[in-house]
Amino acid sequence: MSSGVHWKLHWETELASSDHEELASFFRNTYGPTGKFNAKPFEDGRSWAGARPELRAIAYDSKGIAGHLGLLRRFIRVGETEVLVAELGLYGVRPDLEKLGIAHSIRAMAPVVDDLGVPFAFGTVRYAMRNHIERFCRDGAANIVSGIRVESTLADVYRDCPATRTEDVLVVVVPVGRTMSDWPSGSLIQRRGPEL
């Protein structure tokens, strides 16, 4: 990101209502251009779409919030193996700063992820983001794992809809306390909750 941007880590309990309102506006403006439905969860000052993060890396510049990455520790099931991960999600960069940031947000979060004692950081992205993520993975700090379906619960329950969904997405794995060879094999990841 540009030199005028600085990152700050916030535990969820440190954020005030005004922070959530500012983040909600950021997400509506960032996700809205990708489809009205994508901005809907952020109405009424809500700053999360599915699971609520416990830690956030937030980038600021002279215009306000410039970028965001959320983190939530959780167990997921990969094939037949339970794995503790730091799920990374709710990634966004203000449209005027696009193409300048995912590596910076991960690096801002890295020292805390190390302290959390998790073996892996994990996230999912749409296939449309593949080129963007591949650039981030070039130095080997993260790995794209394709051909895996991911099952999640829906953030809200509706009488006429299933309670879960299974998606074919790109899985991004960042080894933290282990090596990539320790990541279990399997064609299905069960999140056991809503995505971050």
UniProtKB/Swiss-Prot annotation:
State the GO CC annotations: cytosol
Q: Which NCBIfam families match?
A: nodulat_NodA, PRK00756.1
- Quote the protein name from its UniProt record: Nodulation protein A
Carries keyword Cell membrane? no
The lineage's top-level taxon is Bacteria
Q: What is its main location?
A: cytoplasm
Q: What the protein does?
A: N-acyltransferase required for nodulation. Acts in the production of a small, heat-stable compound (Nod) that stimulates mitosis in various plant protoplasts.
Task: Quote the EC number.
Answer: 2.3.1.-
Which Cys residues form disulphide pairs? none
User: Where found?
Assistant: Cytoplasm
Instruction: Give the family from UniProt.
Output: Belongs to the NodA family.
Coiled coil in keyword set: no
Which PROSITE patterns has this protein been placed in?
NODA
GO MF annotation terms: acyltransferase activity
**Hey, what's the signal peptide range on this chain?**
none
Taxonomic source organism: Neorhizobium galegae
Q: Which UniProt keywords apply?
A: Acyltransferase, Cytoplasm, Nodulation, Transferase
